[in-house]
From Swiss-Prot:
One of its GO terms (molecular function) is acetylcholine receptor inhibitor activity. Expressed by the venom gland. Keywords: Acetylcholine receptor inhibiting toxin, Disulfide bond, Ion channel impairing toxin, Neurotoxin, Postsynaptic neurotoxin, Secreted, Signal, Toxin. Belongs to the three-finger toxin family. Short-chain subfamily. Residues 1-21 form the signal peptide. The keyword Secreted applies. It is found in: Secreted. This is Mipartoxin-3. It comes from Micrurus mipartitus (Red-tailed coral snake).
Amino acid sequence: MKTLLLTLVVVTIVCLDLGNSLKCYDKLKKEVTCPEGMKFCHKDVLPATHGNSVLVMGCTYSCGLGPRNMCCSTDLCNK
């Protein structure tokens, strides 16, 4: 009985991911787990030459300012 209870506790901890790791999309739109301390996902559109733009996405420590910056704090919110 104790073994079953211990097994259930371990499974619960693994499933809940008590580390509270944030997940964001990177520039290739793949899911990545953010390192500890990075509490935000971001998506920045940077102007480039000839009317093109560069998309930068991923985890960040803080949110940038500007009309082309998007920052959020929930899993996979920077799509």
